[in-house]
């Protein structure tokens, strides 16, 4: 069975689950998972884990994301993007200056909190928020803490005098769990007008960039040629943030049976409860070990291979 991470280009019009289902058919395996939902109207990078790589989905999900897109000022919708029904309109009679836009984006940068939109997959009391929304219900949603590393204009905004709307073009780097739709709405609030996210493309996720992605057409061609495995990145691509420790033969005999390794064997200076190391044997990533300060040693966190 093939194991690895497929840097898929998700086209618009498909859900992330649609993509997983199609990859299962193409690669003829049920062991497939994606690393972070993209809305149907969003395209871009969607890393897909195949085979044993499904064990690293959580690490890909935890990685930061980068997007480019646009925010249109002057109206709001139920879904915070162009798919919803219009619920508010306020003419932008005079376009905001570049400095005003920059200042609004700056207010959204750093450690901030968000309230997930009603049209989202977040669960409250066991139900998806979008299920409440489709029933016409609004429920209290828990705040989430996120980090916006960068939020900038990528080109000059445009103004449509006929509709009295203004469109801002941006790039954003953010932590997991960020709703860019909600960022767009909040930018409008800072500027004093309703707003929607009018376009979005994911540029980076899980260490993969847009120019590294492959399309379904390319995948199908490789499947026909018998070379589909060549499209898969190794599992350790998802774990590049963790320091590597190369094991001796003796250490590997212990580790493959789930034994601990000492603080000295972990080779890290002043490890703490957040310290993890990736253990490598014969150039193959075998597992992740986490440090236990109370025991002053490393214990298994995730095993990838034992042979």
UniProtKB/Swiss-Prot annotation:
Keywords: Isomerase, tRNA processing
Record field: catalytic activity: uridine(55) in tRNA = pseudouridine(55) in tRNA
One GO MF term attached to the UniProt entry: tRNA pseudouridine(55) synthase activity
Bilayer-spanning residue ranges: none
Pfam families: TruB_C_2, TruB_N
Enzyme class: isomerase
InterPro entries given in the database record: PsdUridine_synth_cat_dom_sf, PsdUridine_synth_N, tRNA_psdUridine_synth_TruB, TruB_C
Entry's Gene Ontology BP terms: mRNA pseudouridine synthesis; tRNA pseudouridine synthesis
Catalytic residue list: 39 (nucleophile)
EC number, UniProt record: 5.4.99.25
Summary of the function given for this chain in its UniProt record: Responsible for synthesis of pseudouridine from uracil-55 in the psi GC loop of transfer RNAs.
PANTHER family for the chain: PSEUDOURIDYLATE SYNTHASE TRUB1 (PTHR13767:SF2), TRNA-PSEUDOURIDINE SYNTHASE (PTHR13767)
Record-stated family: Belongs to the pseudouridine synthase TruB family. Type 1 subfamily.
NCBIfam families the record matches: TruB
Record-given protein name: tRNA pseudouridine synthase B
Primary gene name: truB
């Amino acid at each position: 069975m093939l194991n690895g991470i497929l840097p898929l280009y998700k086209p618009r019009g498909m859900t992330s689950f649609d993509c997983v289902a199609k990859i299962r058919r193409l690669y003829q395996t049920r062991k497939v998972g994606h690393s972070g939902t993209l809305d149907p109207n969003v395209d871009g990078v969607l890393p897909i884990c195949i085979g044993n790589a499904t064990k690293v989905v959580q690490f890909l999900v935890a990685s930061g994301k980068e997007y480019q897109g646009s925010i249109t000022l002057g109206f709001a919708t139920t879904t915070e993007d162009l798919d919803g029904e219009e619920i508010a309109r306020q003419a932008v009679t005079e376009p905001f200056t570049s400095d005003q836009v920059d200042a609004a984006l700056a207010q959204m940068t750093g450690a901030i909190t968000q309230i997930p939109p009603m049209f989202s997959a977040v669960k409250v009391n066991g139900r998806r928020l979008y299920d409440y929304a489709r029933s016409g219900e609004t429920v209290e949603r828990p705040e989430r803490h996120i980090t916006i590393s960068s939020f900038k204009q990528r080109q000059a905004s445009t103004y449509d005098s006929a509709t009295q709307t203004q469109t801002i073009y941006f790039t954003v780097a953010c932590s997991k769990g960020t709703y860019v739709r909600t960022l767009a709405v909040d930018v409008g609030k800072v500027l004093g007008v309703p707003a929607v996210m009018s376009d979005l493309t994911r540029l980076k996720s899980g260490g993969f960039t847009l120019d590294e992605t492959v399309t379904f057409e390319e995948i199908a061609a490789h499947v026909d040629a018998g070379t589909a495995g060549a499209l898969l990145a190794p599992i350790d691509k998802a774990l590049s943030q963790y320091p590597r420790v190369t094991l001796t033969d003796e250490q590997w005999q212990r580790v493959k049976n789930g034994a601990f390794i000492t603080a000295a064997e972990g080779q890290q200076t002043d490890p703490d409860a957040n310290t993890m190391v990736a253990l490598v044997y014969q150039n193959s990533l075998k597992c992740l070990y986490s440090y236990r300060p109370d025991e002053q040693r490393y214990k298994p966190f995730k095993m990838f291979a034992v042979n």
